[in-house]
Amino acid sequence: MISLLQLQLRTDHRRSYVKQMRKQGHIPAVLYGKTTNSQPVFVDAAEFLKQLRATGGTGLLDAKMNDNHIRIIVRDMQKHPIRHDIIHIDFLAVDAKTEIDVHVPIHLVGEAAGVKDGGVLQQAMHQLSIRVLPSNIPPSIDVDITNLQVGDVITVSHIQTNGAYEINHDPTEVIASILPPKQEEEIHSGEEQEPGRPESEEGRETTP
């Protein structure tokens, strides 16, 4: 049986009421969509986090509002700058047959051969914007870097979509690369000299 996230309509917009709801374990939110007018709601924090973890943070959530079963995704979350707990959520109501644009995290898989040789892995892109049906949203996009050598790069063009989604990026955008190791002579550049003695005596005045 599907566990539905309960969305409760929020009719009181006073800050004191919102603060009280947070203390009681609820998160204020807003629900909107192509065929849904923007509506202020709130959800149970524990239940929301449970469902969010189950979908990897990017997937489709089954919800219930006014006895109606709706499907939603998280469009945005605001967190407290110090406590880092969620203080507001934007929910987008979606049509299962209509593609949407979402951001999905990129997960680098394996240990690059170039790193084993002393190179440095640099990840330039951490999220990928894709156009996809709501039911096909992946929790993450895996990118295998095992065979990446020093000086190699992986670009968006290397990602295999298998027809499940479209990528909203230029194919030449870099996802990750292996930088060459720093040379010892670059780290210890220049000759050492005795402390307190200038490198050149030219131009110094002397007394007879």
Swiss-Prot record:
Residues 182-208 have a biased composition (Basic and acidic residues). This is Large ribosomal subunit protein bL25. Pfam families: Ribosomal_L25p (PF01386), Ribosomal_TL5_C (PF14693). The keyword Mitochondrion does not apply. One of its GO terms (molecular function) is structural constituent of ribosome. Part of the 50S ribosomal subunit; part of the 5S rRNA/L5/L18/L25 subcomplex. Contacts the 5S rRNA. Binds to the 5S rRNA independently of L5 and L18. SUPFAM superfamilies: Ribosomal protein L25-like. Gene3D superfamilies: Ribosomal protein L25, beta domain, Ribosomal Protein L25, Chain P. GO terms for cellular component: cytosolic large ribosomal subunit.
